[in-house]
Amino acid sequence: MKHLHRFFSSDASGGIILIIAAVLAMLMANSGFTSGWYHAFLETPVQLRVGALEINKNMLLWINDALMAVFFLLIGLEVKRELMQGSLASLRQAAFPVIAAIGGMIVPALLYLAFNYSDPITREGWAIPAATDIAFALGVLALLGSRVPLALKIFLMALAIIDDLGAIVIIALFYTSDLSMVSLGVAAFAIVLLAVLNLCDVRRTGVYILVGVVLWTAVLKSGVHATLAGVIVGFFIPLKEKHGRSPAKRLEHVLHPWVAYLILPLFAFANAGVSLQGVTLDGLTSILPLGIIAGLLIGKPLGISLFCWLALRLKLAKLPEGTRFQQIMAVGILCGIGFTMSIFIASLAFGSVDPALINWAKLGILIGSLLSAVIGYSWLRTRLSPVV
């Protein structure tokens, strides 16, 4: 029990469980004994009906649309806390990770387009390498233990949070179609109600969650991706402490283990099961997986390092205290771990086009993320001071 408690107390535990879930999915999807069970689980129909309202989806879509909304709720809470009280609370504090995140989204997307611009179908996946998996990246960093400067951890967390926020904006602007104005009207009313609750300083989290469920349903029916509802709810839950209690911080504390140890591993298990049947060298070196691998492995660190270097040269920002530029470059490599967020965007980009494209995209994401994790860990390990 002591070893189990120590494992779950470690910052690396969430990343390790994610890896186990992804490997298990790959094994089950490629085993003659378990592939049928694996796909049957994902295709299991789940229906929810309240009066005339009906939501009928398979298990995979419930995981991607409903459970991931809880993950985005946690992201919303984290972003709000960092903006109001944390590492993004002042312009000077926020400048360096914001500039790094912008470079880390623009350059990978451009590199992907350099490979895929000639194909109008695969071109739609330009945002896939722009994402960072915050749980995986922090998990790999945590494997280095106390050798990692606190400022470097905060920089990676702030960068990844801004990156996630950028991914949310990209999803809202570029991966949304067939809008229902009635449902959008209901969603707008729910958002106004959340704002009123916040202005009236209503501190019961359950009320916000109840309105959030209405918002999620309306957004789902509107054609906008339903996970965005989670972020919106997170922004409106009160952060300010009263009588020593903060509803936002308390909910963040409650949600964190559920997201780290259940929701993200379940998402990884449901989405990382890529069949290797029919995979050839020609396929792996085709423009789609190559563009993703190049975007994650080369574009991410190049964009982050280049934009950070320019920010320092132009005196727009300064290095986090106690860090060196080579360590920032190593963190840039770790940010190439796209995994869950990249897979999520790939499912939006190609979900209604061709399942084979999603398969090739996932392979590119898995290879690019794995290489980024190994190289980033190795490079950073050689550039950190040993523990005395």
From Swiss-Prot:
Lineage: Bacteria, Pseudomonadati, Pseudomonadota, Gammaproteobacteria, Enterobacterales
Family that this chain belongs to: Belongs to the NhaA Na(+)/H(+) (TC 2.A.33) antiporter family.
Biological process, per Gene Ontology: regulation of pH
InterPro entries: Na/H_antiporter_dom_sf, NhaA
Subcellular location: Cell inner membrane
Membrane topology: Multi-pass membrane protein
Gene: nhaA
HAMAP family: NhaA
Role description: Na(+)/H(+) antiporter that extrudes sodium in exchange for external protons.
GO cellular component terms, A-Z: plasma membrane
Superkingdom as given in the UniProt entry: Bacteria
Organism in which the protein naturally occurs: Citrobacter koseri (strain ATCC BAA-895 / CDC 4225-83 / SGSC4696)
PANTHER family xrefs: NA(+)_H(+) ANTIPORTER NHAA, SODIUM ION/PROTON ANTIPORTER NHAA-RELATED
Main location: membrane
Catalytic activity: Na(+)(in) + 2 H(+)(out) = Na(+)(out) + 2 H(+)(in)
Swiss-Prot/TrEMBL keywords: Antiport, Cell inner membrane, Cell membrane, Ion transport, Membrane, Sodium, Sodium transport, Transmembrane, Transmembrane helix, Transport
GO molecular function: sodium:proton antiporter activity
Transmembrane segments: 14-34, 59-79, 95-115, 125-145, 154-174, 179-199, 219-239, 254-274, 287-307, 328-348, 356-376
Name the record gives this protein: Na(+)/H(+) antiporter NhaA
